[in-house]
Amino acid sequence: MAADHTDVLIVGAGPTGLFAGFYVGMRGLSFRFVDPLPEPGGQLTALYPEKYIYDVAGFPKVYAKDLVKGLVEQVAPFNPVYSLGERAETLEREGDLFKVTTSQGNAYTAKAVIIAAGVGAFEPRRIGAPGEREFEGRGVYYAVKSKAEFQGKRVLIVGGGDSAVDWALNLLDTARRITLIHRRPQFRAHEASVKELMKAHEEGRLEVLTPYELRRVEGDERVRWAVVFHNQTQEELALEVDAVLILAGYITKLGPLANWGLALEKNKIKVDTTMATSIPGVYACGDIVTYPGKLPLIVLGFGEAAIAANHAAAYANPALKVNPGHSSEKAAPGT
C-alpha cells in the first residue's frame, strides 16, 4: 500500500477522535488523524485549554489541556499518523477503500472511516456592538487561551451560559476585577455553577449585572472602556476595563461533511447503536452525531468512540471480533 494508506482514517483529533484512535491501535490496526486545527485536542485546545472539566470519570477536576495531553500520550504508543492543518473535503469509494481528499490537496485511503469532528467547523458568535471587531486581539476576546492574559486586569465578561459563568469563577484568582453581564435575569449555565457565581457576587468577589447588554467598546491602542446598558430601562454604565471577554457561543456548521451523502438530522450525523452511519464502513462518534437519547457530554463521547472504533476495526479487518476483550489483559506497546 502507498504511504498515505492506513487501515482506519479518523476525521477529527479532538478528545473523542483521540480515544477512538487508541482503541483502533489496541486492535492492532494503523490509523491516521485528519484535523484542520494545528494541534490535537479540538475545542479543548483551541478554545479553553486552561478551563477545568469536572465530568470525566476518575478526575475530580482536570484542565482541558491536561486531558488532551493524557489522550495524546495514551495513543502515542500506537504510532498514529497526524495530518494536522488539513480539513477533510471529500469522501469517495474506490473499490474496497475509502479516499478522503483534504484542503491541502492530499488524498488518503483507508478501509474504514471514523468521523469524530466535534461540532464541525466553528467560529465565535459576535454580538455586533460598535468597537467589538475593531478591538479584537486588542482587548476583545472570544476564548481564554491562557489565564495569564488576564492577570491583574479589569475584565468584563458577556454571556450567561456555562463558558461565561465558569470563566467568571475561574478568573477570580487571576483578574483584578470581574464584571459579568447577561441580557436575562436567568442564566443557562449549570445550576451549581450559577449558585457559586451568585455567592461570589454576594461576597463582593465579582459583580453580576442583569439584564444588561454591551452597548459599545471604546479605547485607543487597546480597550479602555465598555459601555453597558440595562435592556429594560436603557440606563447606561461606563466601565473602565482592560479586557472584554465575549462568550456568546459559537456558530457551527458541518462544512464539507454535509456533502458526503450521510444521513443527517438537524446538522448532526445519524448513527445507529454501533455508531454506524448510513454509509457502510463509515462510523461517527462524539458531538457530531445524533441518536435517540443522545447527550453532548465528553464522557459519552469516549464510550461512543470505543463502540465506533471496535466496529470500524472489525469492518477493516473481518478476521477481528467486534468485542475487544479487556484492556487489562493486554499491554500497550512500550509498556
Curated annotation (Swiss-Prot):
What reaction(s) does this enzyme catalyze?
A: 2 reduced [2Fe-2S]-[ferredoxin] + NADP(+) + H(+) = 2 oxidized [2Fe-2S]-[ferredoxin] + NADPH
Residues folding into a coiled coil are none
Residues binding FAD, per UniProt: T16, D35, Q43, Y48, A88, F122, D287, S328
Q: Where are the transmembrane segments?
A: none
Under the heading Gene3D superfamilies, the entry gives: FAD/NAD(P)-binding domain
The note describing how and how many cofactors are bound reads:
Binds 1 FAD per subunit.
Matching entries from InterPro entries are given as: FAD/NAD-bd_sf, FAD/NAD-binding_dom, Fd--NADP_Rdtase_type_2, Ferredoxin-NADP_redctase_2
Family assignment from sequence similarity: Belongs to the ferredoxin--NADP reductase type 2 family.
- Protein name listed in UniProt: Ferredoxin--NADP reductase
Organism listed in the record? Thermus thermophilus (strain ATCC 27634 / DSM 579 / HB8)
Species lineage, top-down? Bacteria, Thermotogati, Deinococcota, Deinococci, Thermales
